Amino acid sequence: DLYWEEIEAPTEDLKGTEKYYSFHLPAEVNRVKGLTAIILKDALDEKDLPQMERREGQDWIGLRIRHKGKITDLYINQLADGRLMHSNSWIMPDGWMTDAYMFAVSYPEGTEAKNAKDFFIAYGSALRRGNETYFSSLAKLFVIQKAEGKKLDLWIDGQPKINTTFRSTKKPVSVEVNDKKIPVVYQKSQIKVKL
């Protein structure tokens, strides 16, 4: 089991000592990744806090967060942390397929993740599920996608020029990228964004 101990050791300037924490793992490993969630309460007596469930799979770790009728699945790709720059870093968590370092998908409780319209993608070039492409780019990007009614809001960063597509089952009335309206280019359930 994972456990930690408090150790007293010299300070950086060697003029005193201070306490450090040493983590001990159940097996010898050459790298460790962790996930920390900090929840700030709005009031001292607040009781309605998000419920978090730790999750993991082949080459990924993550959380399922449930709060006020909404589920957010957060995934961290353990292959895409920058050490394997020219190696394949694709993972397949819960039916998704991506090369993103981190991604999250939010959807109403009682519905399926495949019908989600809100996504966060950190340093990724694609997000797929089955035969559906939810996001595709020739470059790795940072993306936030939020669909409300017939409007699609996108925040995209990471490259000076953007050429990407996003899945939308219906043609939106308007598309905004980084708070600027762009023409809606829609074909075969895909919205094209070129900046």
Identify the residue ranges that each predicted region occupies.
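CBM-like, beta-strand-rich accessory domains located in the C-terminal region of large
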Residues: D1-S168, V173, V177-L195
